[in-house]
Amino acid sequence: MDVYQDIWNGSFPELITNPSVDRNRFFSSYMQTYIERDVRDYQGTTNDLKFYKFVRAVAVRTGNLINYEDLARDCDIDRRTAQKWLDTLQASGLVYLLPPYSSNLTKHIIKTPKMYFLDTGLACFLANIDSPEALEASYLNGSMLETHTLCEILKSFWHNGENARNLYFYRDANKKEVDFVLEKNMTLYPMEAKKQHCRAAMIVRIITFSKN
């Protein structure tokens, strides 16, 4: 299966196992239930329309550094509300915040986390991407591929009963960047998500180097 088909499908079992399910209706119902039940459990009453707009704003920024000012401006809310709402998305399992790698030897690095949607199918729905072909042609194809890669890495941790506390990304002030960095046994394992066009498949390039 082409990687963009896989990304667009997402990971909801109902959509994968039953092709007859109306995708748009499913995600619309999911978001309505999520806001009316889950979000109110975390933060009480909220402006549903603005919160939905906020979730969409996060979806089109998946794989990007958190910028509360941009989110607040686009959704006509203040920075404090943007931070509170992103915390809710994280706490409810809709979004994952990936921390930057840092050590005593890395002084000129970006210290802001990146935010990722934990289901790329839902992210595509919220971004109004209506097919795998539209996804591959869109400006979001790179960030969605990166998001998909992170989701697969996280699943490998969780399925083995492990957490991902040693997983990071790297970016310095000169914009040199590594998509993901795993720290294990005093060794860093940088990983880059790339599209292998000749076989329409996703590959992860892993380079190993010692912390020392």
Residue spans for each PLM region:
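Interdomain motor-coupling "hinge/lid" segment immediately C-terminal to the ATP-binding subdomain
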Residues: 1-60, 64-65
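AAA+ ATPase "lid" subdomain C-terminal helix
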Residues: 15-21, 80, 93-96
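C-terminal helical "lid" subdomain and adjoining coupling/linker elements of P-loop NTPases
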Residues: 18-19, 41-46, 73-77, 100, ...
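Helical mechanochemical/support elements of P-loop NTPase systems and associated helical scaffolds
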Residues: 47-50, 67, 78-81, 118, ...
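A short alpha-helical element within helix-turn-helix/winged-helix DNA-binding domains
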Residues: 65, 70-72
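Short amphipathic alpha-helical interaction segments
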Residues: 76-91
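A cross-kingdom feature that marks ATP-driven nucleic-acid transaction machinery
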Residues: 87-88, 93-95, 99-212
